[in-house]
Amino acid sequence: FKQSDENSQLIRQFLSELNSGKLSSGLLKISSLSKLASFLDCERFAIYDSRAIFSLNWLLFKYTNADLFFQPQGRNRELEIRNMNVLFHFSDIKPNYRKPDVSFHQYCGLLQYLAKQVYGEQAKPYRIEMLLFGIATTWICADMDQLIKFDCLRNQDFQTA
């Protein structure tokens, strides 16, 4: 975080709301706030990272009927090219999204559950978060490419709105 009154206020607000199960609008626009939560209590909280959310949303979309998570802005070109909101916009697919105020806590709860299912009872949620992060630009992008052709966008100056 850059030292500023605004960032200090955001951190105080985030910490005061963290244990309530709900976060005010806009608090997850800064992934560093979820990093703070994960550092404070890695048993309960995971980093709400754009790559991890991207992977999780694709898996939820492809294999379940579960509501998707709010997708934070990222800086990865491969994920930008495969913007799921654009995909949904130009199709008949209209997914439901979780409410932003509870999305972070539901994400952390799901990662806690999945970590135990995949790695055993003592596993921490960050293990699943790192797995999701790691497969975003490899397995997830390749899986999407099998279903949808994104090659036309790869060599152009493509910017999402």
Segments predicted by a language model, with ranges:
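C-terminal accessory module of base-excision DNA glycosylases/AP lyases that mediates lesion recognition
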Residues: 50-54, 63-161
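Catalytic Zn2+-binding segment of zinc metalloproteases
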Residues: 38-51, 59-64
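Short, flexible loop/turn elements at secondary-structure junctions
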Residues: 1, 40-41, 132
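Long, highly charged, low-complexity intrinsically disordered interaction regions
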Residues: 1-22
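Helix-hairpin-helix
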Residues: 18-41
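Generic structural hydrophobic/aromatic packing signal, biased to beta-strands
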Residues: 10-15, 36, 111, 128
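Short, surface-exposed helix-loop/turn micro-motifs enriched in polar/charged residues
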Residues: 24-28, 44-48, 120, 124
